[in-house]
Amino acid sequence: MQQRRPVRRALLSVSDKAGIIEFAQALSARGVELLSTGGTARLLAEKGLPVTEVSDYTGFPEMMDGRVKTLHPKVHGGILGRRGQDDAIMEQHHIAPIDMVVVNLYPFAETVAREGCSLEDAVENIDIGGPTMVRSAAKNHKDVAIVVKSSDYDAIIKEMDANEGSLTLDTRFDLAIKAFEHTAAYDSMIANYFGSMVPAYHGESKEAAGRFPRTLNLNFIKKQDMRYGENSHQQAAFYIEENVKEASVATATQVQGKALSYNNIADTDAALECVKEFNEPACVIVKHANPCGVAVSTSILDAYDRAYKTDPTSAFGGIIAFNRELDAETAQAIISRQFVEVIIAPSASGEALKITAAKQNVRVLTCGQWAQRVPGLDFKRVNGGLLVQDRDLGMVSEAELRVVSKRQPTEQELRDALFCWKVAKFVKSNAIVYAKENMTIGIGAGQMSRVYSAKIAGIKAADEGLEVKGSAMASDAFFPFRDGIDAAAAVGVSCVIQPGGSIRDDEVIAAADEHGIAMIFTDMRHFRH
């Protein structure tokens, strides 16, 4: 597919002007005639470029406040005309062939994201002429190049220089695919926006209608292919959202190591999202999507050392996340002590990278700092459908806690309770976390009964010789029976934090009082499946 087409005439009409002046200058310098509209034409003319206004070319003025600019046969005939087949009819109607269309669309997403955006503002930022030209050019990619991304400008000029002012059919086809992806994403944004405004008389509650559109259109971009998926017999790829505003595994830069696997990405996401909950220097070690060790301290080195002590066996081959820069001392401690799949941190010092480079299989990712958590949607695929919910960004403050036991928690117990409550949010349900002095000492994850998660947490602490007496215990959901409290008391837990809300809360609280345990209700559940 190397059939070349020379670029002699280009139509430029862009909302995002980034790079357009330089691109237009490069085209003009190579003898390309420039057509343009409105603000783009004025900008190019101000820079001294020879440009013809589309209204001058068509003989028909822009009208209706710019709503009608390019919807004209001389424009679309020039784009859609098939070279060698429609030449006669084009000549008869004085339609000049347009070999390249450079268009990006009205900023609909940015407009509706603004606080106080009215429906009228949204409507006026629905591009009509732009998508029409994009689709026309993409349809006729055999003869026309359609450019919708400024990131392609340099490559296009380089190819034209290499091919005497022409572009290959391979390139035009690739540009056409990008164009259809672009218009599909654009229309999806509009459909989602209006779909979320469906009123109650269509069957939804006002609350649901304002949050979830009746038809959900999703657009993700493939970042990489995988060797395989969760298991070796499954094929897989990693897709990411455009314009992600929060530091994440999707936006992270891999600075060292071999390609990330499917499971690497899933576990790195779990580790990073957990470590984001802490303001103090923190370390989270994850294995199979569950934290197996978490700690906060005055330095990430000490946080790592304490997190590792929770469960050294499970930490082998795990994922390690930090909320501070990876320094040389911490990197050396990790490399000397254990096998690690991935380390992710906001940044990594040059000295740290020299140390981790000694282990070629260690993947190091930097994700940048995060100023705040960004609300969004979580998805869970079920056979034949998709469950959609808000991200679980909820977290209680100390002021919102309710002490329901006779005994009040000590200051240290309260600190430990809040710490392990944050960790429990990221442990698979049923989740039980034991913590003492800002480090986990036992984690029970994913059990079908809550009491067994509590028992497992105690067993893990005992296996590592960690002192449970005087520790805090967090449960991601309420205790349906007192047996979980009895199990915790048997190993020395002195404070329990849980949502509350069971019909047997009175029995559970009574059990805490019998054992002299301080019990705190959060009134917020954190199931994780």
UniProtKB/Swiss-Prot annotation:
Domain MGS-like residues, every copy: 1-148
Enzyme nomenclature, EC number: 2.1.2.3, 3.5.4.10
GN (gene name): purH
Family as reported in the entry's similarity comment: Belongs to the PurH family.
Superkingdom of origin: Bacteria
MF-aspect GO terms: IMP cyclohydrolase activity; phosphoribosylaminoimidazolecarboxamide formyltransferase activity
Alphabetical UniProt keywords: Hydrolase, Multifunctional enzyme, Purine biosynthesis, Transferase
Associated pathway: Purine metabolism; IMP biosynthesis via de novo pathway; 5-formamido-1-(5-phospho-D-ribosyl)imidazole-4-carboxamide from 5-amino-1-(5-phospho-D-ribosyl)imidazole-4-carboxamide (10-formyl THF route): step 1/1; Purine metabolism; IMP biosynthesis via de novo pathway; IMP from 5-formamido-1-(5-phospho-D-ribosyl)imidazole-4-carboxamide: step 1/1
Catalysed reaction, written as an equation: (6R)-10-formyltetrahydrofolate + 5-amino-1-(5-phospho-beta-D-ribosyl)imidazole-4-carboxamide = 5-formamido-1-(5-phospho-D-ribosyl)imidazole-4-carboxamide + (6S)-5,6,7,8-tetrahydrofolate; IMP + H2O = 5-formamido-1-(5-phospho-D-ribosyl)imidazole-4-carboxamide
PROSITE patterns given in the database record: MGS
Any one cellular-component term (Gene Ontology): cytosol
Bridged cysteine pairs (disulfide): none
Domain notes: The IMP cyclohydrolase activity resides in the N-terminal region.
Name listed for the protein in its UniProt record: Bifunctional purine biosynthesis protein PurH
One GO-annotated biological process of the protein: 'de novo' IMP biosynthetic process
